[in-house]
């Protein structure tokens, strides 16, 4: 994953700089092959932007602010969806619409101005680039100090002692092959990747409209999806810090499974209002599950492989989203069987989520050993005091290396 090798900032700037020319070129392409190739490249670049920005937001925050910052980013994305729908209503030409949206992305190259868009200090420390990390942290400390005050002596000493207090090994030897010796990290990756895949794949099963394929149905489905995503962000912001990541993820997937089973078994006996209600409930809960599984994955994957691991989780979510266009290609044939399979997988997710650790208000794991210690407390044995999931959850330090 390039973000783990070349840095979050460099990947974000590179992909943002290429989005504009790629989008404008795709709108100007004359052949269907050129349009498909450039649209594929555009989606690839936007996925890189999404991953890089998500990592930088997460690694910049302290444990108490990670949820709020993640949900704020999701709400900004939902606002972008509403803006796109409004522009699509105004502009009937898709080529003009694509140029209008992607061309201004070139302006994001101004983020490359020194001191404006900073690299992740956490990534720099893990990569043993201590001088660059000290520079980034000093800039952040100076920007956040009260106006007119100098940087305190404690902050200066902390910056000077940064190299001695972070004896991390070089990360160039870390790869997916090295993860084979860390079964707990693999378990968390597989469970959260599978949950994210199902949460994205099952969404189209809850659309109460859109079967006719008319433009009004398309806009209504898009508005419904964006609206339920906004409601899911509000719901997560209210409940997750109170009841924990794992508990709310379990509740969301349970509601997803219940909505699927009701629609599968009682469709012929429900009126339109009940069908719409359970469809909105399933769409809402699947949106919440996708958002929370991504956040939980980013909090249990160590910094040394966070770019690769979170990229894998997001890729599985995007792969699950292909179930809707794949179903349309088959003209709706096998939709019931597909819904049955996805509902069964949702029930399997409910069982697997209980094996995940709780990460509320905890420091991010830095190296593979930290990630291996993040596990669900045993039901039969008292957990050791150095385990990441030890209760109480407030101000739990990372285990000693």
UniProtKB/Swiss-Prot annotation:
Pfam families: Sugar_tr. It is found in: Cell membrane; Vacuole membrane. The keyword Cell membrane applies. Its main location: membrane. Gene3D superfamilies: MFS general substrate transporter like domains. GO terms for cellular component: organelle membrane; plasma membrane; vacuolar membrane. Keywords: Cell membrane, Ion transport, Iron, Iron transport, Membrane, Receptor, Transmembrane, Transmembrane helix, Transport, Vacuole. GO terms for biological process: siderophore transport. Cell surface receptor for LCN2 (24p3) that plays a key role in iron homeostasis and transport. Able to bind iron-bound LCN2 (holo-24p3), followed by internalization of holo-24p3 and release of iron, thereby increasing intracellular iron concentration and leading to inhibition of apoptosis. Also binds iron-free LCN2 (apo-24p3), followed by internalization of apo-24p3 and its association with an intracellular siderophore, leading to iron chelation and iron transfer to the extracellular medium, thereby reducing intracellular iron concentration and resulting in apoptosis. This is Solute carrier family 22 member 17. The gene is Slc22a17.
């Amino acid at each position: 994953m390039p973000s783990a090798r070349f840095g979050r900032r460099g990947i974000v700037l590179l992909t943002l700089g290429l989005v504009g020319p790629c989008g404008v070129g795709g709108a100007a392409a004359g052949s269907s092959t050129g349009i498909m190739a450039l649209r594929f490249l555009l989606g690839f670049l936007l996925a890189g932007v999404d991953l890089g920005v998500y990592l930088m937001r997460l690694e910049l925050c302290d444990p108490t602010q990670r949820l709020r910052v993640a949900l704020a980013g999701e709400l900004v994305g939902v606002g972008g969806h509403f803006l796109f729908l409004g522009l699509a209503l105004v502009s009937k030409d898709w080529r003009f619409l694509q140029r209008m949206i992607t061309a201004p992305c070139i302006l994001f190259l101004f983020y490359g101005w020194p001191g404006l868009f900073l690299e992740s200090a956490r990534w720099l420390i893990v990569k043993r680039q201590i001088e660059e990390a000290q520079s980034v942290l000093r800039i952040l400390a100076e920007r956040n100090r009260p106006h007119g005050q100098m940087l305190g002596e404690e902050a200066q000493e902390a910056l000077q002692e940064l190299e001695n207090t972070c004896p991390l090994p070089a990360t160039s030897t870390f790869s997916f092959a090295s993860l084979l010796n860390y079964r707990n990290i693999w378990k968390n990756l597989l469970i959260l990747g599978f949950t994210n895949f199902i949460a994205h794949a099952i969404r189209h099963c809850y659309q109460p409209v859109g079967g006719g394929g008319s433009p009004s149905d398309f806009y209504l489905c898009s508005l419904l999806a964006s609206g339920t995503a906004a409601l899911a962000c509000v719901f997560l912001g209210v409940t997750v810090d109170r009841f924990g990541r794992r508990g709310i993820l379990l509740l969301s997937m349970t509601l997803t499974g219940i909505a699927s089973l009701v629609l599968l078994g009682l469709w012929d006996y429900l009126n339109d209002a009940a069908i719409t209600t359970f469809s909105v409930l399933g769409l809402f809960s699947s949106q919440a599950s996708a958002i929370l599984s991504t956040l939980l994955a980013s909090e249990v994957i160590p910094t040394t492989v966070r770019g690769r691991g979170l990229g894998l989780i997001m890729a599985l979510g995007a792969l699950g989203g292909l179930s809707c266009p794949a179903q349309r290609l088959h003209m709706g044939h096998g939709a019931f069987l597909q819904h049955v399979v996805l509902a069964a997988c949702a029930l399997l997710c409910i069982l697997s989520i209980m094996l995940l650790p709780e990460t509320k208000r905890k420091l991010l794991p830095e190296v593979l050993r930290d990630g291996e210690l993040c596990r669900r407390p045993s039901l039969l044995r008292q957990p050791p005091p150095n385990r990441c999931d030890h209760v109480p959850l407030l101000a739990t330090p990372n285990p000693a290396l």
